[in-house]
Amino acid sequence: MKSTDRILAHKYSIALSSLADKKDLPSLLAELKEIHLAIGNSSFFYSPAVPKKEKKQALSSALKTDNFLIKNTLFLLIDNKKLNLLGQIIIDLNKTIESFTNTVSAEVYCAREMDDKQQNAVIESLKKYFKANFINADFKQDKTLISGLKIKTADYVIDGSTKNNLQKLKQVLQD
């Protein structure tokens, strides 16, 4: 995606978040995700050969929502031929919601599967580290790490894996 499209998607997400009540943002995001999944890669909605009016009619009949803000946003995207930005708008809106709720999303990679107690301990540690109210952690297994954890957030990568430590040691010994 071009940087100008990312900037434009960010502007749409800012407009959405400023027009909606903060408490309604999570449900708004969920509805947009559902709509994005429903229209997916449909050539109908993205084809320049299909008139805007037909796209709007099809979207209106397919939408389960009565949310005025969602309908108008989608119609505006269709009018401006920017429906392809919906995925990025959802990503940006999710980041906005996370900042409002002081939530951090993290991918946690570990060499072996962790039980619930271990996962909760990692989540509590991340809450303290990031001074966050909530942590959305996605735990994944990566056997190449040997042991330890590797944590990725939007802004940070924390690598406490044995694999990383061995690579650092190798680098030091080679220098």
Swiss-Prot record:
What keywords are annotated for this sequence in UniProt?
ATP synthesis, Cell membrane, CF(1), Hydrogen ion transport, Ion transport, Membrane, Transport
The listed locations are: Cell membrane
UniProt membrane topology term = Peripheral membrane protein
Work out whether the entry's keyword set contains Acyltransferase. Answer: no
The GO molecular function terms of this record are: proton-transporting ATP synthase activity, rotational mechanism
| Subunit comment | F-type ATPases have 2 components, F(1) - the catalytic core - and F(0) - the membrane proton channel. F(1) has five subunits: alpha(3), beta(3), gamma(1), delta(1), epsilon(1). F(0) has three main subunits: a(1), b(2) and c(10-14). The alpha and beta chains form an alternating ring which encloses part of the gamma chain. F(1) is attached to F(0) by a central stalk formed by the gamma and epsilon chains, while a peripheral stalk is formed by the delta and b chains.
**Major location (coarse):** membrane
Q: Which organism is it from?
A: Elusimicrobium minutum (strain Pei191)
Upper lineage is: Bacteria, Pseudomonadati, Elusimicrobiota, Elusimicrobia, Elusimicrobiales
Per the record, the similarity remark reads: Belongs to the ATPase delta chain family.
Matching PANTHER family = ATP SYNTHASE DELTA CHAIN
The UniProt entry, under InterPro entries, shows:
ATP_synth_OSCP/delta_N_sf, ATPase_OSCP/dsu
User: Its function?
Assistant: F(1)F(0) ATP synthase produces ATP from ADP in the presence of a proton or sodium gradient. F-type ATPases consist of two structural domains, F(1) containing the extramembraneous catalytic core and F(0) containing the membrane proton channel, linked together by a central stalk and a peripheral stalk. During catalysis, ATP synthesis in the catalytic domain of F(1) is coupled via a rotary mechanism of the central stalk subunits to proton translocation. This protein is part of the stalk that links CF(0) to CF(1). It either transmits conformational changes from CF(0) to CF(1) or is implicated in proton conduction.
- What GO cellular component term, any one, is given? proton-transporting ATP synthase complex
By what name is this protein known?
A: ATP synthase subunit delta
In its keyword annotation, does this UniProt entry include Aminoacyl-tRNA synthetase?
no
Q: HAMAP family from the entry?
A: ATP_synth_delta_bact
